Amino acid sequence: MAFLELDHVSVVFPAVQGMLSSRKPASVVAVDGVSLSVEKGEILGLVGESGCGKSTLSRTVMLLQKPTEGRIFLEGEELTALSPSEVRKRRPDFQMVFQDPYASLNPRFTVYATLKEALECRRRKRTFSQMRDDVAELMERVG
C-alpha cells in the first residue's frame, strides 16, 4: 500500500466570462486525471511550466481544494471521502511548504524552533526534554 495515492484526480474551474456573453460558460481544466503513488520515505517533486497545475494539484492533495473527479488516499484512507470535520482532525498529519518559503517559514527561526513550533501546534503537552527528543527524532527521520 502506498503512503500517498492519487487516483485519476482532476480539477476543473469555471472560466470567467463577460456579462453580455451568450455562449455557454466555459471551463478551465487545471489538473486532468493525475494518478500517482508515493511510498513512505520517498520524495516526489512536481516540475512543470508556469500555469500547468502544480500548485492546484498540491492544494488538492492537502484538501485545500476539492477535486472535481478522482480520489486521494493517505496510508490507505480515502481523504476525499472525509467530512469537513474529519479533514480538520487529519490536517495536523500532513503539511505543505508553499512556493514562497518566506510566507511559510520564519527566516529568524532555527530548524529546531520551526520543528518545535509545528509539534506544539498538535496540542500535545511535552516536557522540554521530550520536545528536544521529538525534534531530534524528526530531524533524524528526514536526514
Question: What are the roles of these predicted feature ranges?
Answer:
Residues 20-25, 66, 79-95, 121-124, ...:
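ABC ATPase NBD coupling module
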Residues 47-49:
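The feature captures the beta-strand-to-loop junction immediately N-terminal to the Walker
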Residues 62:
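Helix-to-loop junction immediately C-terminal to a conserved catalytic motif
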Residues 71-73, 77:
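ATP-binding/catalytic-site motifs of ATP-hydrolyzing domains
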Residues 78, 129-143:
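Conserved ABC ATPase "signature" region
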Residues 100, 109-121:
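Q-loop/switch helix immediately C-terminal to the Walker
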